[in-house]
């Protein structure tokens, strides 16, 4: 089995068949004999996603990642599906099988791609619908006549039989036996080309997965989708096999290798929500070999508990609304009684009754709150529980470089220091630019989370690199910054180097970078970090211990119970009811 379209998708699925060593750009992944390939309708170009399941061609053309030659993806999609799901039979020093494929399948697959692409480009179909269409037309499971795949399989079997009968005489008996065994394995696999029911299940499973992917895209917020794609399981696998440089300049479709029948049974037994969660877990890197009946039941229980939690939250909110309504009615009733009685006596009695009513409401709230069973309160970094106790254990120590801490000062002082400093990047910036940048750089509260024991649940390590004579490390987290009426999705970037005397990491770069789903891959790549980093870090001890930093009045930190996200809130010191800014850092997706 070998790969013919290496410039676009690099993945080859290898089971019992040969993989040509001459295909230098191909990448092989071992596939369990019981597993099949599932293709997710997410197309990537290097680190960046260029096609979502919900994307129509008109959306694709407007995309910032629009390829100059989209036909290469669209018009080769059927070949991509064939190579990933079926594969090629090929033998070294024997081109009969290659010629047979070119004769019977190449033109057929090309026509499938062209027709599907025309419908996609001219019509109102989404990318996932186009992928489903390609599956249906390749495998022709509902065809009343002879299927092209079956005819090709019959011709292949004849060629394999011929090859077995004409083994080279110079081969030893041991070599012949080995070759005969391999050819029989190949023949057994090719015989499945006639098994319409097998391919019908594969098409059904693909449609099920495509639908789950659409629901994921429609149901998640932009920052949640960014968190999902940031993990990039297939990208990580490609980088491990190809290296960072080659993988970042290739195109590929996200896929997984899993027991198709198990997935279909899980969908029938547990429904679409569990299927969607299974797809999420595969996108996060869950291996198909680890997805069995026991694991599916575990996922189903997690989904049920999540639903119960949601129902409890809805019930709680309804009770709170009812209490508020009763409270309002009670106050209105008390006011009516006051008017009916004499002013002096009425005031005394009315106020007394109102207070008694409020007291009863308060007691009811406390009892119901204590009875509620919810998600345990999670303490992150400098956030505090209602008891007011500080976080204990597992906290890390960081130092802060002056180029980070200076953003806490007034815009005038920041400008003055940058103008007098050595970094050309910031010299001569206008006061207005400094004010704008302060919004994105004055986020030192992030260090409360970074030095907590939960930091790895939020931050991803994008790797180390050396620049300007110093080894540096970069971490990123997905977040949302709300300021001035705007809601901006992006990443929180943290750059560190080690203090040579103490070995303590020094934070020399800290900012929120606005980016969307399409540009997130670039932002998270080590190449981007190195290219946009300062050339040389001033290491003349221009930094202080993070623990010495005093947070200004009106800045609070908390973990949002419902989502597990970490929030930094900047309130107006003069009016704490007014929120000036809010930075929410997303927890990394949960791997079950």
UniProtKB/Swiss-Prot annotation:
Residues 306-339, 353-362 have a biased composition (Basic and acidic residues). This is UPF0329 protein ECU01_0110/ECU01_1500/ECU08_0040. InterPro entries: DUF3654, UPF0329. Pfam families: DUF1609, DUF3654. Belongs to the UPF0329 family. Coiled coil: none annotated. It comes from the Eukaryota. Residues 306-404 are annotated as: Disordered.
């Amino acid at each position: 089995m070998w790969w013919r379209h290496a410039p676009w998708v690099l993945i080859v699925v290898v089971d019992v068949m040969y993989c040509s060593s001459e295909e230098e750009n191909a990448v092989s992944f071992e596939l369990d004999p019981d597993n099949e390939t599932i293709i997710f309708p997410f197309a990537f170009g290097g680190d960046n996603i260029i096609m979502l399941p919900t994307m129509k061609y008109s959306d694709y053309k407007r995309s910032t990642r629009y390829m100059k030659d989209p036909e290469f993806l669209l018009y080769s999609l059927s070949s991509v599906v064939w190579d990933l799901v079926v594969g090629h039979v090929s033998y070294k020093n024997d081109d009969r099988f290659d010629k047979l494929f070119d004769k019977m399948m190449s033109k057929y697959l090309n026509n499938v791609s062209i027709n599907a692409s025309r419908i996609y480009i001219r019509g109102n179909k989404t990318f996932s619908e186009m992928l489903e269409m390609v599956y249906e037309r390749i495998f022709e499971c509902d065809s009343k006549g002879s299927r092209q795949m079956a005819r090709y399989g019959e011709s292949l079997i004849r060629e394999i039989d011929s090859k077995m009968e004409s083994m080279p005489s110079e081969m030893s008996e041991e070599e012949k036996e080995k070759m005969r065994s391999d050819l029989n394995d190949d023949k057994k696999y090719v015989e499945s080309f006639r098994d319409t029911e097998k391919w019908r299940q594969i098409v059904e499973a693909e449609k099920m997965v495509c639908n789950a992917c659409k629901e994921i895209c429609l149901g998640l917020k932009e920052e949640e989708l960014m968190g999902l794609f940031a993990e990039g399981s297939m990208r990580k696998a490609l980088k491990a096999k190809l290296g960072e440089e080659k993988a970042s300049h290739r195109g590929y479709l996200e896929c997984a290798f899993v027991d198709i029948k198990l997935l279909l049974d899980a969908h029938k037994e547990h429904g679409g929500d569990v299927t969607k969660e299974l797809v999420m877990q595969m996108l996060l890197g869950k291996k198909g070999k680890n997805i069995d009946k026991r694991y599916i039941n575990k996922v189903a229980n997690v989904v049920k508990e999540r639903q119960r939690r949601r129902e409890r939250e809805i019930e709680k909110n309804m009770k709170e609304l009812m209490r508020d309504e009763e409270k309002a009615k009670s106050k209105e009733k008390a006011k009516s009684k006051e008017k009916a009685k004499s002013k002096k006596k009425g005031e005394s009695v009315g106020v007394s009754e109102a207070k008694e009513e409020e007291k009863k409401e308060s007691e009811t709230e406390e009892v119901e709150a204590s009875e509620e069973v919810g998600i345990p309160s999670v303490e992150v970094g400098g956030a505090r529980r209602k008891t007011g106790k500080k976080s204990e254990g597992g906290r890390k120590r960081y130092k802060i470089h002056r180029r980070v801490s200076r953003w806490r000062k007034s815009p005038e002082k920041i400008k003055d220091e940058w103008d007098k400093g050595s970094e050309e990047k910031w010299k001569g910036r206008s006061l207005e630019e400094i004010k704008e940048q302060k919004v994105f750089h004055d986020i030192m509260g992030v260090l409360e989370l970074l030095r907590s024991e939960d930091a790895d649940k939020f931050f991803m390590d994008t790797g180390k690199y050396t620049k300007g004579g110093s080894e540096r490390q970069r971490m990123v987290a997905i977040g949302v910054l709300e300021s001035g009426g705007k809601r901006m999705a992006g990443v929180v970037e943290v750059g560190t180097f080690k203090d040579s005397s103490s070995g303590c990491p020094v934070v020399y770069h800290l900012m929120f970078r606005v980016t969307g789903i399409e540009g997130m891959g670039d932002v998270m790549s080590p190449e981007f970090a190195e290219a946009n980093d300062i050339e040389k870090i001033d290491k003349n001890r221009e930094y202080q211990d993070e623990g010495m930093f005093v947070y200004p009045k009106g800045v609070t930190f908390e973990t949002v119970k419902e989502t597990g996200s970490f929030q930094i809130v900047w309130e107006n010191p003069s009016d704490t009811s007014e929120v000036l800014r809010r930075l929410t850092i997303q927890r990394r997706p949960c791997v079950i």
